[in-house]
């Protein structure tokens, strides 16, 4: 809040000499001083219209001595002002304006922050940011409910952070919900600090309750930050840099993992991969095209979410087939108590001998149960016929 509170000490705004020559023009410079009462402010206060004068109200005495004195601030808003370069290109500068009430009874006007005395700004801003930086849900709710003021739940500090960012970082589910109920944006990125959304901040600080609340309130789980990272990628980066097995970081890792799990629920539907059929990308962007065991459509899935053994087999060039049953076994050539199994395939006519590690554990268990039944003289179900 330092940047918000360091404004020129200006509590009175003086109009220009009304006898000075007036040249109609359109100005976009800020800051400007209020022309009161012989100028009219536009609602957005982005362009200053100097071509529409108003008749000054009589205050008695010389008009040069007519002042508009601020009574108090009753609302705020964040605006974007255009800035034009010499080459004609345009950018925007974000600024804060305040709706001020005047002691002389003039109707409230929107004034740039830098044109208002620091003590007046502080009187309005300090209660809000004190509550926001503590994630004080009760005080935030009370301030938003104050009908004498119109609080903007998306008010920004100098870094473009809102109260929602602080509530997310401190893990206050109650404060997150109170702000959202008042209309706060649950997905607004901060202007500084990497363009993080509240969801990035909540997961990065290991706040699972805040992550869950933000997702329930509509936060986009795959929105990128300023570096192009999704919230899940950010927490994976943080976890990778947080030491394992260190008592000093044990609780932090637990919190980060809990927050990551909340995100995973929103991003992924868990399913069993039948096989990997293709791959693309490199490094952190590596993805695999997988077939699901339940018959769902093929999908591209990030490498981190595919079982390591499947990835290794695909990268090694191994092919997959669907086994129907194990029909026989024999001791492997290398001996040492190792076995090979004769596997009947669904999509391959000829059965093949495979090492145990290449055969589904459930099929092996079924085969052994059949063999046990035969050895005991029971009626074990026969294996499927083998072509040959």
UniProtKB/Swiss-Prot annotation:
One of its GO terms (cellular component) is signal recognition particle, endoplasmic reticulum targeting. The keyword Aminoacyl-tRNA synthetase does not apply. GO terms for biological process: protein heterotrimerization; response to high light intensity. Residues 68-137, 271-332, 321-379 form the Chromo domain. The keyword Transit peptide applies. GO terms for molecular function: disordered domain specific binding; identical protein binding; protein-macromolecule adaptor activity. InterPro entries: Ankyrin_rpt, Ankyrin_rpt-contain_sf, Chromo-like_dom_sf, Chromo/chromo_shadow_dom, Chromo_domain, CPSRP43_chromodomain_3. It is found in: Plastid, Chloroplast. ANK repeats lie at residues 123-158, 159-188, 194-223. Keywords: ANK repeat, Chloroplast, Plastid, Repeat, Ribonucleoprotein, Signal recognition particle, Transit peptide. Residues 1-24, 46-66 are annotated as: Disordered. Residues 1-42 form a transit peptide. Component of the chloroplast signal recognition particle pathway. Targets proteins into the thylakoid membrane. Homodimer. This is Probable signal recognition particle 43 kDa protein, chloroplastic. It comes from Oryza sativa subsp. japonica (Rice).
């Amino acid at each position: 809040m330092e940047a918000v509170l360091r404004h020129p000490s200006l509590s009175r705004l003086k109009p220009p000499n009304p006898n000075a020559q007036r040249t109609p023009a359109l100005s976009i410079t800020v800051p400007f001083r209020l022309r009161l009462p012989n100028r009219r402010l536009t609602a957005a206060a982005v362009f200053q219209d100097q071509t529409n004068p108003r008749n000054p109200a009589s205050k008695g005495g010389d008009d040069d001595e007519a002042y508009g004195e601020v009574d108090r601030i009753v609302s705020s808003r964040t605006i974007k002002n255009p800035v034009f370069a010499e080459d004609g290109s345009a950018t925007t500068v974000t600024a804060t304006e305040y709706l001020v009430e005047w002691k002389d009874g003039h109707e409230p006007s929107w004034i740039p922050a830098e044109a208002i005395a620091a003590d007046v700004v502080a009187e309005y801003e300090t209660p809000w940011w004190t509550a926001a930086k503590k994630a004080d849900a009760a005080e935030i709710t009370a301030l938003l409910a104050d009908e004498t003021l119109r609080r903007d739940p998306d008010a920004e500090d100098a870094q473009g952070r809102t109260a929602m960012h602080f509530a997310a970082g401190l893990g206050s589910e109650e404060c997150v919900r109170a702000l959202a109920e008042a209309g706060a944006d649950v997905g607004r990125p901060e202007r500084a600090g990497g363009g993080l959304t509240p969801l990035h901040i909540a997961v990065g600080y290991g706040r699972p309750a805040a992550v869950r609340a933000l997702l329930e309130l509509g936060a986009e789980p795959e929105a990128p930050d300023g570096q192009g990272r999704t919230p899940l990628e950010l927490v994976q980066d943080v976890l990778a840099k947080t030491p394992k097995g260190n008592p000093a970081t044990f609780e932090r890792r637990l919190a980060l993992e809990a927050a990551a799990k909340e995100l995973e629920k929103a991003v992924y539907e868990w399913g069993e991969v039948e096989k990997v059929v293709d791959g693309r990308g490199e490094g952190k962007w590596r993805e695999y095209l997988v077939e699901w065991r339940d018959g769902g459509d093929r999908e591209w899935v990030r490498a981190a979410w595919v079982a390591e053994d499947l990835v290794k087999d695909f990268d090694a060039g191994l092919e997959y087939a669907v086994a129907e049953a194990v029909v026989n076994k024999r001791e492997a050539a290398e001996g040492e108590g190792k076995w090979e199994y004769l596997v009947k395939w669904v999509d391959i006519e000829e059965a093949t001998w495979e090492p145990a590690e290449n055969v589904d554990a459930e099929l092996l268990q079924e085969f052994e149960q059949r063999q046990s039944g035969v050895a005991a003289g029971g009626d074990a179900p026969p294996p499927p016929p083998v072509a040959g």
